[in-house]
Each structure stands twice: as structure tokens, then as C-alpha cells.
């Protein structure tokens, strides 16, 4: 069996140990005579799967009891609408725009109320994180929104913005479980799992209980109300059962590896290997201000579209897949998500 070096932005690489365990259980999950793909989401077996997954996630992140963990569907993009539908009580929200995903989230939220773009890095092609220590936060804002790690541009908030007491909402899709996090600093953390945690099709939302109410915008669909899913334990309708099962296995793998402190150290090691190479290279260069570099996403260029294309082509021939940059920016992009071993970065550095 041949496994390539896969640098995909998502769906991304999963721990081989998890994939092998899932393969062993594919036809018969723990003696029940069926696959997790086939079992009822109301069964005792699946109840154990989803409850264990939630508890392991709580253990990893130190999630307090006054936060709900929701396993949802619809992708992170669906949250762009679900958040204002549920949280825009005053119909005002502040957005910090540091990339395409925050920009899209702000555009979607503007359909439901007033959106203030209180900081942005679009003036320099989202190559940095703006100073967020003294933001012009609207006194009527229901929340302040960020995309904490920018998959396309390779930037990361190293310090959370000063929201001046307003609820912080964060899309953490591409940095989920890559390092320790203080959940209490957020009102809502959410992300698609297909980058650091599991297969596509699952969104995890961690939301403070006081934000889960029946007081949502008029016309909000039942399925887009956080209370619907919180009250039903993420089982209001058939959940993405197999995806949750794989997420649960990844949570156990992360705990076995030593938790998020160990993951942060490992991710720093992987990123340093690649950034050090780029900084001394006469051919390649990074595109992000050093102080704001992401540990997860590393874009780089040669300065020539022709050379970029040649590199991507020859890298693929050498077994290094999915290094082409995002379609909106070009160049190359190396994804350093949590699961892969540092040997992948050694491969690209050579």
C-alpha cells in the first residue's frame, strides 16, 4: 500500500492509527454485527459513541459545564447565517475581517442586521492580523466575530481581540485542537472538523448556555436554532453519525498523544521546519508577516506563476499532493494540520 504526502486544506489527513481502527470495525462495530454507518442514531451503541466523543472533547479543551457541545451539519458556512439568526438581538454585530471566510461571514450576517467591519487586513491582501487592542466596538453590538486562523492566507490571531465586554464568536475550523484554548474567553467557538479532527460533514459548535435561547430572529428555521440541537443532544434529526464516530476516535488519539500542549509543541516543530527553510531560500518566499504566521497553513511563492506551476507538478510526481495554493491567491500552500507526523514537512523542505 502506498500513501502519499497529502497537504490538502481539507478534507485533510487523519491519523493512520484511527483509519486502521475504523477499518477493523467497518463491518462489525464491537460485536453488534453492523457498521456504525448502518446503526440507528437512537441506538444504545450510538448513544455511547456520541456521549463519549463529547466527554473526550470536553476533557481535551477543558470545556466548562455551562457550555454546550453541539455536533451539527451544514458546514462552517452555514454558521455564517446561523450565528446572526440566533445572536443578533440588537441586530448589530462587529466583524474583524482578516480573510475570505470572515469576509463571507460578514456579508451573510449583513442580511440580518447592521454589520460593522471594525478592523481589516484587506489593504495588504490579508497578509497580517490588525491591531485589535483598542477596537471601535459598537456599544449595541451583540457580538464580535473573528476567523481565528486563516486557511487561505496563513495568518493566525496570536492574541484574542479586546472586545470590551462583548461576546466573542470565533471560527476555528483550521486550528481546532491544534493548541490549548481558554474556552471561557469565547461565547461561541465553532468549526468544520475536516481539517484537524475528522471527515467532512460535521460541524462542532461550543456555545455558552446563556446564548442558547428561544429569542431568535423571526423566521429562523427550526433546524437553524441552537436551542433545537442543544435540547435534543445533537439528535434532533439524524446526525452525521459516522463522522462523529471518527471524530471521537481522533479525540481519543489526541488524548493518547498527550493532549493539546503536546500537539502545540509538535505543531510548532513542524511549522518551524518549513518557515526556517522558506526564510533562507533564494527561490521561495512566504507571503505573511512573521509575527502573524499560522502554525497550520503556510502559503509561499516563487514570484513566477510558471515556476509555481512547475513546482506543484513536480511535487505531485514526487508524491507530494495538494500543494497548489487556493484558487483566489495562487502560489503554493502547505497544510500542517495536527494529525501528520513532522516527516511530511521534512519531505517538502528537501
Language model regions located:
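Conserved PLP-binding catalytic core of the aspartate aminotransferase-like
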Residues: 284-315
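A glycine-/small-polar-enriched, mobile loop at the entrance of the PLP active site in fold-type I
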Residues: 3-54
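Active-site phosphate-binding strand-loop segment of PLP-dependent enzymes
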Residues: 10, 109, 121-176
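PLP-dependent aminotransferase-like
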Residues: 77-142
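Active-site C-terminal subdomain of aminotransferase-like
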Residues: 15, 193-275, 289
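Conserved active-site segment immediately N-terminal to the catalytic lysine
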Residues: 169, 183-194, 203
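Conserved N-terminal alpha-helix of the aminotransferase class I/II PLP-enzyme fold
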Residues: 32-79, 86, 100, 108
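Conserved small/polar residues in nucleotide/adenosyl-binding loops
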Residues: 337-343
Amino acid at each position: 500500500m502506498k500513501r502519499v504526502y497529502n497537504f490538502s486544506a481539507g478534507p485533510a489527513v487523519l491519523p493512520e492509527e484511527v483509519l486502521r481502527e475504523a477499518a477493523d470495525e467497518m463491518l462489525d462495530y464491537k460485536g453488534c454485527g453492523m457498521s456504525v454507518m448502518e446503526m440507528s442514531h437512537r441506538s444504545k451503541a450510538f448513544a455511547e459513541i456520541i456521549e463519549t466523543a463529547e466527554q473526550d472533547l470536553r476533557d481535551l479543551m477543558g470545556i466548562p459545564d455551562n457550555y454546550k457541545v453541539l455536533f451539527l451539519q451544514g458546514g462552517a458556512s452555514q454558521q455564517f447565517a446561523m450565528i446572526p439568526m440566533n445572536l443578533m438581538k440588537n441586530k448589530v454585530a462587529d466583524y474583524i475581517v482578516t480573510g475570505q471566510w470572515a469576509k463571507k461571514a460578514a456579508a451573510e450576517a449583513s442580511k440580518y442586521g447592521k454589520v460593522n467591519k471594525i478592523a481589516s487586513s484587506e489593504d495588504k491582501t490579508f497578509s497580517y492580523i490588525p491591531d485589535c487592542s483598542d477596537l471601535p466596538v459598537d456599544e449595541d453590538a451583540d457580538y464580535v466575530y473573528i476567523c481565528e486562523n486563516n486557511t487561505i492566507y496563513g495568518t493566525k490571531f496570536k492574541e484574542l481581540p479586546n472586545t470590551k465586554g462583548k461576546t466573542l464568536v470565533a471560527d476555528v475550523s483550521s486550528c481546532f485542537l491544534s493548541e490549548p484554548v481558554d474556552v471561557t474567553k469565547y461565547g461561541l467557538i465553532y468549526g468544520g472538523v475536516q481539517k484537524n479532527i475528522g471527515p467532512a460533514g460535521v460541524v462542532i459548535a461550543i456555545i455558552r448556555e446563556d446564548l442558547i435561547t428561544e429569542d431568535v430572529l423571526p423566521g429562523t428555521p427550526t433546524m437553524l436554532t441552537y436551542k433545537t440541537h442543544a435540547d435534543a443532544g445533537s439528535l434532533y434529526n439524524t446526525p452525521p453519525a459516522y463522522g462523529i464516530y471518527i471524530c471521537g476516535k481522533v479525540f481519543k488519539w489526541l488524548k493518547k498523544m498527550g493532549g493539546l500542549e503536546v500537539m502545540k509543541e509538535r505543531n510548532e516543530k513542524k511549522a518551524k521546519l518549513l518557515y526556517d527553510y522558506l526564510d533562507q531560500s533564494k527561490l521561495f518566499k512566504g507571503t505573511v508577516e512573521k509575527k502573524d504566521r499560522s502554525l497550520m497553513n503556510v502559503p509561499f511563492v516563487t514570484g513566477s506563476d510558471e515556476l509555481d506551476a512547475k513546482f506543484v507538478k513536480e511535487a505531485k510526481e514526487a508524491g507530494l499532493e495538494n500543494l497548489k495554493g487556493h484558487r483566489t491567491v495562487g502560489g503554493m500552500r502547505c497544510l500542517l494540520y495536527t494529525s501528520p507526523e513532522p516527516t511530511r514537512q521534512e519531505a517538502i523542505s528537501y
